């Protein structure tokens, strides 16, 4: 990188591969950022030498510039569990991973089921956040599954969706009412698809490995029964339904069939569901304990097919920080969850290297598709606006080392894994929020 007398946030990227699926753009181009404003994208940008002296000129050959990534499913733990993560540390982890927006789940303490908590989260994000924070409100008051939260109040204060994530809405009538109510406010309802009667006491995927280990399993039906119910309710109400963390082949099939009938449903999965299989638990390593559980090889392949054919719209991390005490204990008592903000990008790019996804498809899963699902004008490169983009090297080789993560927690099962693909710079709101480039 040629720095010279560059002014703050003046950058000229030369010969970058610019991928913006929302604009159907995938081309080699120069990219100009002037005073933090994304000013131009075209094959060759010539600046007079006296003006060029005020820019950092970066040879971006073989690198990508993409819209700032969006993770539509994270747990920032604030308020109430700041020993696991805070808005400050979680959003720093996000920009280190290439993300410029994160949607945070409502299972905080107190639960985000009212305007006061939503407003608190947004205020903390303004004060200490490093990227955009998108609060998701609760479906039910206190996540108790008894009565609906005030969706209008939640949306009015800044919530972008509603969910009881971390637990299902077990009462079918309440879920129906939630979909009908949310439709009035054009809010998607995010379903944590789990039948609690079928999953009760389960510690991992039900199958040969759970039998061998003597661990109580969670059958695929625990997810699929609830997916089927919620698809039926979405079809009945015409409301927008989003299925979170899809993990089974049966769920992929049902979602695909529902889409073909015109049901207004979208879906996400997480990197661990297309990367890991349940035999990883043979060592009883609690880093692999997550809900829904890591499944078998056939499910992994089905998830990949669902991503490729568009059945699964988005990849979200389900970033779920936990303290070492909560993970370093007997398997039965260990908390469920994996952090993912700083490990997701190389795992997603592996789908490109193995030709499951094209580069444009992969970028869409973490940019314009989540933005579309949440109904937000994000996930695209907007000219003459404050730069919100990610500069990445898809072939950057490194070993994932959770001891260097910006997240407060270390529960990452990919620690020590050699991998490729990393964010080099993350621009948010016209500023460099994170950079790995030398000064």
Curated annotation (Swiss-Prot):
Q: Which coenzymes or cofactors are required?
A: Zn(2+)
Write out the pathway annotation from the protein's UniProt entry.
Pyrimidine metabolism; UMP biosynthesis via de novo pathway; (S)-dihydroorotate from bicarbonate: step 3/3
Q: What does the entry list as the binding residues for substrate?
A: 75-77, 107, 291, 322
Keywords in alphabetical order? Hydrolase, Metal-binding, Pyrimidine biosynthesis, Zinc
Name of the protein in question? Dihydroorotase
For binding Zn(2+) 1, which residues are annotated in this chain's numbering? 73, 75, 165, 318
- UniProt source species: Syntrophobacter fumaroxidans (strain DSM 10017 / MPOB)
Molecular function (Gene Ontology), one example: zinc ion binding
Which portions of this protein are annotated as coiled-coil regions? Answer: none
Taxonomic classification: Bacteria, Pseudomonadati, Thermodesulfobacteriota, Syntrophobacteria, Syntrophobacterales
Q: Which Gene3D superfamilies match?
A: Metal-dependent hydrolases, Urease, subunit C, domain 1
Output the GO biological process annotations, alphabetical, semicolon-separated. Answer: 'de novo' UMP biosynthetic process; purine nucleobase catabolic process
Gene expressing this chain: pyrC
